[in-house]
Structures are given as structure tokens and as C-alpha cells.
Swiss-Prot record:
Compartment(s): Cell inner membrane
Residues that span the membrane, as ranges: 26-46, 210-230, 242-262, 303-323, 333-353, 384-404, 769-789, 793-813, 821-841, 875-895, 913-934
Gene3D superfamilies hit by this protein: Multidrug efflux transporter AcrB transmembrane domain
One cellular component term from this protein's GO annotations in UniProt: extracellular region
Main location: membrane
Domain of life per record: Bacteria
Keyword entries, A-Z: Cell inner membrane, Cell membrane, Membrane, Transmembrane, Transmembrane helix, Transport, Virulence
Inducers of expression: Transcriptionally regulated by MmpR5. Repressed by iron and IdeR.
Annotated protein name in UniProt: Siderophore exporter MmpL4
Keyword Cytoplasm: no
Length: 967
């Protein structure tokens, strides 16, 4: 019993005619007409792919990224919109902006606010003198207003909103010397979409022209080239049409990257498949086979390769659907579906066109196919496999060594033409503002209570200071620092100095009142002198009163004596007296009336005596009181003198105090001015009355939510926020915010961080994970496909391994070209997009080569390698060059990122075609020998069997085909 080997030849086997090949052979014309009908239908009844792309464009924003969630939350809390689409209107003047510019600006703002369909909110800061400085340039020649637009960035509504804003700006006449620009992230995204669509026709024309020239040089037949290009055109039209149908129906979304990549892949892959088909057919014809036999030989030799290649490309691009980033996710289904359609067309239309054309000899070789050069290459490889492998690895090191220096860029502006409107707007902004001014970070904290109080404002200022101290941050605008610096007059030293200022205003009056104390002291001195004089006078008056008492006592005695004598006289004359009172007519008798009057006067002496007695009593009381009264005056004089002394002392003391207060006030004022001038924020404080200020309440609307539960901070970078340094600062900003709130009443507040650097920080992390996911899934899928086709584990592993090595070297060469030679950093999208495509297309040529190894293995391992190299060398090289040039033609796109992706893929294909497929893979196969085909069992040398000419190989076959056996 003999062992069966995989490379044992079956001399009795007849040429196999696969069922599908026979069906295509039989129904070639209907197949051609059917595919043409499909092209007509999708062209006539379905909008173009570019039109569908505009109609069904999807947002490229990763909705589950923290920065985008923060953006949505900030918009909701501050009632500024629910989209991630923002734009800016820049107003630039030749001279500092004046009243005319303000009037023009107010008109624009009014129209923008009136467009509720496209503009969700307008941050009118320049219209308020309190906040105008925050959006005006230092030279006063530019200002801007930020708009929140309807529709998420990249969607049709967002693009429509950008056009609506531009229409308003263009339709509003600007004053002389004033110009307005519409720019910002959404405007840039819309312009990028338009530029990509506009460049698509140019890319296609350049690609077709280059392919036509290259194929004409290869085949030397215009008819062959035209038929091949028509076939490729049908593949492209069908692939684009089917994807357009899916997009138009809403089944899938599209982006400008997906449209560009699908078009280039369909053209390149379709051309490659055509080259494979024609090349294998011409090889069979030159080997002496008839047209039908050559047709079946072609199908057996290329169908599985085309299918495997197409499935590999479709599968690898479909793996992008597993990514989380819409940038990559949106490439997956459109490219995969398009490639499946292209493969279906290539596997049916290609052989059908070949069959029909071969009837008229249109695809027969016009010259002898030279294989000797490639056989010599194969001979060198199998004779010295290790040196060849070392040499190819050394060449690969050129690219691999460039990888550590790889630096990416996230600034989309650098990859768009300067003439697009958004870039013109950014250029105008750059003339007056820093790059960071147009690309701020927005941090918001949300608490469970109203923060409009002095205590929470201390925490908010602490948070602002903590963020400001992060390296790379140039300014932090918040409610405690609306213009990015500490508010004037908010430091405790300055507030103390302001209190002293109030005291200084009253100290003059206090000093005047103190000087009045001197006048009062003088008045008191006068009073003391008066009291002293009064004391002496009252002392004299007391002695006089005492003498008056004695005199009055004597008068009283005299009066009493006089009264007694008058009484005696009255008693003697009483009878006569009675007459005078009894006489009725006494008043008429002079003598009577006179005597009567005398008697009345004598009666008054008695009253006088009584009154003198009373007077004597009063005088005695006065004589008693006057000494006491005189005794009271010296204490008064002494008290007055003491009071005068105290007033003089108080005046002296107050004068010293006032002088000291003036000196202290000068120091406090100087300290307050110093803290204010230095913008020192170490002792920030806002008193409660500030919160009642109308101007401050207006400012709070920009930085605090309506309920006071949320506060936001506008953070500006020192450099470009989209640089690696700016992106790295996001973690530091978040950490600084968390540390600043630690141990404060706002410790449990939620922190949201959005903005340019925050977005690209999330994109950078997401891209790394997506690249890892897509690359691993693609490698696994490619390995499975290779394993199914080759049935050899080691061979499949070698194909995948060499592709991975080629991938690293190819990307390194792209880094070398763009970063070190052209001095342009690669866009961050280039790595992921080119890696996935290179993983897919890079395995094609290795698959074709290894499949040919398997076909020629019956001649022996080494001889099979030589024959395979000779048979596929020119075909694969032509296909690789065409594919590479096709992808490199993307460099004519207005989008430099598309050009970078194309050139990176092109360099990878050149490296894979000229180095990996030509030298590395054959050398590994030669080194491994029969282990290359494990677990298949193969003979190292061919089995000895009698030579029997086959029907498909006439005796006239060139001897060179069998004289190259080396094992």
C-alpha cells in the first residue's frame, strides 16, 4: 500500500471543466447583457453615489465617546441645542471694528436667530459690552459669534444648516472694509464632504488614464485594453449602483471617505482581476492550448484566487463595521458590499467577455510572453533562500525603522485646500486670534444645588485655578474670571483696601470734628474764666447779702417802732378819723379827703412792717444759700479745667490715630492695587451683594445654568489643541478638576469635558482600539480564507505573516515619504484605513503565487516555485503596479487625507508586489520545503512516472517549460 501525496500527478486525469465555468461559457452573451442592464438600471433609476452620499451622509461623531456625551449634556443644560454641530461667524475689518461693524453684526445675529430651522442658539457675546472683550481680538479688528446648528456634524441637516448660515452672511451687505466668514467644525466637515465629492471625478479620470496607459504598454492592444476597462467600468458602475441603492433606501449611511475608497478599490481590484484573467488565458494560449482549453485553464487558475481576494477585501473592510468610531464603521458595509458586487461581476462578466472576445482573437497575446527573467529570479530564490530572505528583511527594516518616529496629526485644516471657505475663515481668525481661541475646551460641573453663593464661588474659582495651572493651558474663562483672568477688585486685600478707601473719605470730616475740639477747649477756657470771675462776684454778693440781712433787721425794728407810734396816734385820733370815713361827701371836701388819705397811709405802715418781716426771712434764706452757692463754683471750675485737659488730650490722641489711619490706609490701598494689578487670585472672594448686581447677573447667564446647578469653564490651550501635546493635556485637565473639587461641597458634582482636544482624545483612544479590533478580526478572517483555499496551515500563516510584515514596512515607508521628506504629518485616519485595506489587498498576490505553487507542485517543490514565479511574475507585477498606481491616483484629491491613504496603500502594494511576493514569500517556501504545506503531505521531488502528453499540452510545448526542474 503506497502513501498518497498531495503533489502526486494523475496521468489519467482529464482537464476539469467546472460547472460555473461551463455555465458562463454557455451563457456568456446573456451574462454580458444582464450586467449591462443592471448598470443601466442603477444609472437611470438611482441617483449617483455622490448624490446619495450627500443625501444619506452620516455623522462621523462617536456618540458614546465621553466628549460627545458631555457636549450634548452641556447643550441641554444651557438650552443651546442638542446637536454637536457648531459654526462660527468671523467678522474682520481693515481697521478696528466700530459702530458700523456692530450694526452689521447686530443685523446678522437677528437674522441668524430668526432661522429657527437651522440655528438652535447664538452666543451673542460681542453684542453685550460686559462680555464683548471675550470674543474680540486684541487689535480690535476681529470678533466672532458662535452658533449651535441643527443636525449632527456631517449629516445632511448639518450641511444644510451650514449653507443656510452662509446664505445669510452672503445676502447681508457688509460695510466697506468689513468681511464675514463662516467657519468652524461643521463648516469644515461640510466643505470636506463637498471637496471629496468634487475630487471624485478627477480621481476617476486620472486613474482611468493611468490604467489605460499602463495596460496599453502591457498588452500592446487598444481593443484588449478598452474591453478590460469596459469590464472594469461595469464592475465599478454595478458596485457603486448597488451601494447607492442601499444608501438611497436608507439601509446604510455614507461618507465621502467611503465613496472615495469604494471607487478606488473597485477600479483597482477590478483591473487586477481582469489582469489575472487575461494573463492566465494568454499564458495558456502561449503554452499551446486552444481557446476553449485556455478558457477553462484560466478559470481553474484564477476563479478561486479572485473569489478569495474579493472575499478577503470584502471581509477585511467589513471588519471595520465592528469598530466603534463612525469614521471606520461607515466604511465597512459600503466597501464590503461594493467589493462583493465587483467580485461577482469579475467572476461572471470577466470570463464571459473573455469567451466572447476570444472567438475573435481579441485577447490572444500580441507578442511572446517572456518568463525567463522571472524564472531566473525564482532560480536565485530557491538556490539561496536564506540570503534572499535576509536581504528582503533588511529592505523591510527601512520602513520598520521609520515607524518609531511616526507622528500623527488631528488638524483637518492641514489636509484641506486653502481656498475652501472654512479654511479661509480659519485663516482670517488666525490673523487676529490664537489657534486655541477658535478651538476651546468646555468643562462643565453639575451639582445638586444652586451654586450662586459666595461659598460655592470660592470652589469654582479654586477649580478654575486648578485647571489654569495645568501645563499647556493659557487661559480659563469662568464666572469668576469672565475674561480669562481674575476679575478686578475681587481679592480680599483689595476689598479691605476699598473699606479703607471709605474710611479715607470720612477721615477729613473726622479730623475737622477733632479740630472742633480745640475750639471747644478754647470755649471751655473762656467759661472757666467766667466762672472764676463769677465766683469772686458771688462771694462779694454773699457778704453783701449778709450785710443786707443785718440792715433789714434794723429796718424791721424801726418799722415796728414806727408802727407802734402810728398806732398810738391812730388810737388818739380814731374818733375824728371815723368822721372822715363816715362823711359821705368826704371826697368832695378837700380837707376831709386829705386827712382820710393820711389815715389810709398810716394804715399801710402796718402792711409795710409785715412785708419787711417777710423780706427779712427771704434775705436770711439767701444769706444761708449764698455761701453754699459760692462753694459750688470752685468744683465746677475744676471740672471744667479737667474737661478741657481731657479734650486737649483726646484731640492729641485722635490726631495721632488719624495720622496712623492715613498711613495704614496708604499701605492697604497700595496692597489692594498691587493684588489687583498682579491679577493675584490667591484670596478670591465675592460678597453676597455682588450677586444682586444686574451686570453680574448678565454675566452669569453665560457661565451658569438658569437654575444655578451647573457651571461651565472655557479652557484655552497655549498651543494647537489638536497637537499630540494638546490631546495629552485632557487627562491632566480632568485630574486637576477632580483634585480641585476634592473635600469641597462640590466634591460629588459631575464633571463633563468637551471641546476640540477632548474630542480628538476620545477619537485617538477609540481609533487605537478600533484599529486593534479591525486588524485582529481581519487577520483572523484572512487566515481562515487563506487556509480554506490553500488547505495548508503553514502556507496560510506565511501569507498572513508576510502581509503583516509588509504592512509595517509599507506604513513606515509612507511615514518616511510624508513626514520626513515632504514634512507633512500623516492624518490620524491614514493608519487605520490603510492598514485594513493593505491587510486585504496585500494577501491577493501572495494567494495567487501560493495557489500557483500548489498547481505546479507536481514538478517538485523547487521546480514548482520556479515555474510559479515564471508564470505569475509578470501578471502579478502588472496587477500590483496597476493597483498601486490606482490607489496612488487618490493623491490628486483635494482632500490630502485621501491622497495620503492612497499613497500609503500604493507604497504597500509596491512593496508587497516587488519585495514580498517576488522574494520573501518564495524564499520562505523554499526554506520550509515540504513543511510549508503542512498538514498536507507532499513530495520534495516529483514521483517518477512515464511521460504521457496530455490533451491540453501538445508535444510542441517549449522545452523550457520542463528543463527548469531543480528538485
Amino acid at each position: 500500500m503506497s502513501t498518497k501525496f498531495a503533489n502526486d500527478s494523475n496521468t489519467n486525469a482529464r482537464p476539469e471543466k467546472p460547472f460555473i465555468a461551463r455555465m458562463i461559457h454557455a451563457f456568456a452573451v446573456p451574462i454580458i447583457l444582464g450586467w449591462l442592464a443592471v448598470c443601466v438600471v442603477v444609472t437611470v433609476f438611482v441617483p449617483s453615489l455622490e448624490a446619495v452620499g450627500q443625501e444619506r451622509s452620516v455623522s462621523l461623531s462617536p456618540k458614546d465617546a465621553p466628549s460627545f456625551e458631555a457636549m450634548g449634556r452641556i447643550g441641554m443644560v444651557f438650552k443651546e441645542g442638542d446637536s454637536d454641530s457648531f459654526a462660527m461667524v468671523i467678522i474682520e475689518g481693515n481697521q478696528p471694528l466700530g459702530d458700523a461693524a456692530h450694526k452689521y453684526y447686530d443685523g446678522l445675529v437677528a437674522q441668524l436667530r430668526a432661522d429657527k430651522k437651522h440655528v438652535q442658539s447664538v452666543q451673542d457675546l460681542w453684542g453685550d459690552p460686559l462680555t464683548a472683550a471675550g470674543v474680540q481680538s486684541n487689535d480690535g479688528k476681529a470678533a466672532y459669534v458662535q452658533l449651535s446648528l441643527a443636525g449632527n456634524q456631517g449629516t445632511p441637516l448639518a450641511n444644510e444648516s451650514v449653507e443656510a448660515v452662509r446664505s445669510i452672511v452672503e445676502s447681508t451687505p457688509a460695510p466697506p472694509g468689513i468681511k464675514a466668514y463662516v467657519t468652524g467644525p461643521s463648516a469644515l466637515a461640510a466643505d470636506m464632504h463637498h471637496s471629496g465629492d468634487r475630487s471624485m471625478a478627477r480621481i476617476t479620470m486620472v486613474t482611468v488614464a493611468v490604467i489605460f496607459i499602463m495596460l496599453l504598454l502591457v498588452y500592446r492592444s487598444i481593443i484588449t485594453v478598452v474591453l478590460l476597462l469596459i469590464t472594469v467600468g461595469v464592475e465599478l458602475t454595478a458596485a457603486r449602483g448597488v451601494v447607492a441603492v442601499l444608501g438611497h433606501s436608507g439601509a446604510i449611511g455614507l461618507t465621502t471617505f467611503a465613496v472615495s475608497l469604494l471607487t478606488s478599490l473597485a477600479i483597482a481590484a477590478g483591473t487586477d482581476y481582469g489582469i489575472f484573467i487575461i494573463g492566465r488565458y494568454q499564458e495558456a494560449r502561449q503554452a499551446g492550448e486552444d481557446k476553449e482549453a485556455a478558457y477553462y485553464t484560466m478559470y481553474r487558475g484564477t476563479a478561486h484566487v479572485i473569489l478569495g481576494s474579493g472575499l478577503t477585501i470584502a471581509g477585511a473592510t467589513f471588519c471595520l463595521s465592528f469598530a466603534r468610531m463612525p469614521y471606520f464603521q461607515t466604511l465597512g458595509i459600503p466597501c464590503a458590499v461594493g467589493m462583493l458586487v465587483a467580485v461577482a461581476v469579475a467572476l461572471t462578466l470577466g470570463p464571459a467577455v473573455l469567451h466572447v472576445g476570444s472567438r475573435f482573437g481579441l485577447f490572444d497575446p500580441k507578442r511572446l510572453l517572456k518568463v525567463r527573467g522571472w524564472r531566473r529570479v525564482g532560480t536565485v530564490v530557491v538556490r539561496w533562500p536564506l540570503p534572499v530572505l535576509v536581504a528582503t528583511c533588511a529592505i523591510a527594516l527601512v520602513g520598520l525603522l521609520a515607524l518609531p518616529g511616526y507622528k500623527t496629526s488631528y488638524n483637518d485644516r492641514d489636509y484641506l485646500p486653502d481656498f475652501i471657505p472654512a479654511n479661509q475663515g480659519y485663516a482670517a481668525a488666525d490673523r487676529h486670534f490664537s489657534q486655541a481661541r477658535m478651538k476651546p475646551e468646555i468643562l462643565m460641573i453639575e451639582s445638586d444645588h444652586d451654586m450662586r453663593n459666595p461659598a460655592d464661588f470660592l470652589v469654582l474659582d479654586k477649580l478654575a485655578k486648578g485647571i489654569f495651572r495645568v501645563p499647556g493651558i493659557s487661559r480659563v474663562q469662568a464666572i469668576t474670571r469672565p475674561e480669562g483672568t481674575t476679575m478686578d477688585h475681587t481679592s480680599i486685600p483689595f476689598q479691605i483696601s476699598m473699606q479703607n478707601a471709605g474710611q479715607l473719605q470720612t477721615i477729613k470730616y473726622q479730623r475737622d470734628r477733632a479740630n472742633d475740639m480745640l475750639k471747644q477747649a478754647d470755649e471751655m477756657a473762656t467759661t472757666i474764666a467766667v466762672l472764676t470771675r463769677m465766683h469772686s462776684l458771688m462771694a462779694e454778693m454773699a457778704s453783701t447779702t449778709h450785710r443786707m440781712v443785718g440792715d433789714t433787721e434794723e429796718m424791721k425794728e424801726i418799722t415796728e417802732e414806727l408802727r407802734d407810734h402810728v398806732a398810738d396816734f391812730d388810737d388818739f385820733w380814731r374818733p375824728i378819723r371815723s368822721y372822715f370815713y363816715w362823711e359821705k361827701h368826704c371826697y368832695g371836701i378837700p380837707i376831709c379827703w386829705s386827712f382820710r388819705s393820711i389815715f389810709d397811709a398810716l394804715d399801710g405802715i402796718d402792711k409795710l412792717s409785715e412785708q419787711i418781716g417777710v423780706l427779712l426771712g427771704d434775705l436770711r434764706e439767701m444769706d444761708r444759700l449764698m455761701p453754699q452757692m459760692v462753694a459750688q463754683i470752685p468744683p465746677q471750675i475744676e471740672a471744667m479745667e479737667n474737661m478741657r485737659t481731657m479734650i486737649l488730650t483726646m484731640h492729641s490722641t485722635m490726631t495721632g490715630i488719624f495720622d496712623q489711619m492715613l498711613e495704614m490706609s496708604d499701605n492697604a490701598t497700595a496692597m489692594g492695587k498691587a493684588f489687583d494689578a498682579a491679577k493675584n487670585d490667591d484670596s478670591f472672594y465675592l460678597p453676597p451683594e455682588v450677586f444682586k448686581n444686574k451686570d453680574f447677573q448678565r454675566a452669569m447667564k453665560s457661565f451658569l445654568s438658569s437654575d444655578g446647578h451647573a457651571a461651565r469653564f472655557i479652557i484655552l490651550h497655549r498651543g494647537d489643541p489638536q497637537s499630540p501635546e494638546g490631546i495629552k493635556s485632557i487627562d491632566a485637565i480632568r485630574t486637576a478638576a477632580e483634585e480641585s473639587l476634592k473635600g469641597t461641597p462640590l466634591e460629588d458634582a459631575k464633571i463633563y469635558l468637551a471641546g476640540t482636544a477632548a474630542v480628538f482624545h476620545d477619537i485617538s483612544e477609540g481609533a487605537q482600539w478600533d484599529l486593534l479590533i479591525a486588524a485582529i478580526s481581519s487577520l483572523c478572517l484572512i487566515f481562515i480564507i487563506m487556509l480554506i483555499i490553500t488547505r495548508a496551515f503553514i502556507a496560510a500563516a506565511v501569507i498572513v505573516g508576510t502581509v503583516a510584515l509588509s504592512l509595517g514596512a509599507s506604513f513606515g515607508l509612507s511615514v518616511l515619504l510624508w513626514q520626513h521628506i515632504l514634512a507633512i504629518h500623516l492624518h490620524w485616519l491614514v493608519l487605520a484605513m490603510s492598514v485594513i485595506v493593505l491587510l486585504a489587498v496585500g494577501s491577493d498576490y501572495n494567494l495567487l503565487l501560493v495557489s500557483r505553487f500548489k498547481q505546479e507542485i507536481g514538478a517538485g517543490l523547487k521546480t514548482g516555485i520556479i515555474r510559479s514565479m515564471g508564470g505569475t511574475g509578470k501578471v502579478v507585477t502588472n496587477a500590483g503596479l496597476v493597483f498601486a498606481v490606482t490607489m496612488a491616483s487618490m493623491a490628486v484629491s483635494d482632500l490630502r487625507v485621501i491622497g495620503q491613504v492612497g499613497t500609503t496603500i500604493g507604497l504597500g502594494l509596491l512593496f508587497d508586489t516587488l519585495i514580498v511576493r517576488s522574494f520573501m514569500t518564495p524564499s520562505i517556501a523554499a526554506l520550509l520545503g515540504r513543511w510549508f504545506w503542512w498538514p498536507l503531505r507532499v513530495r520534495s521531488r516529483p514521483a517518477r512516472t512515464p511521460t504521457v502528453p496530455s490533451e491540453t499540452q501538445p508535444a510542441g510545448r517549449p522545452l523550457a517549460m520542463s528543463s527548469d526542474r531543480l528538485g
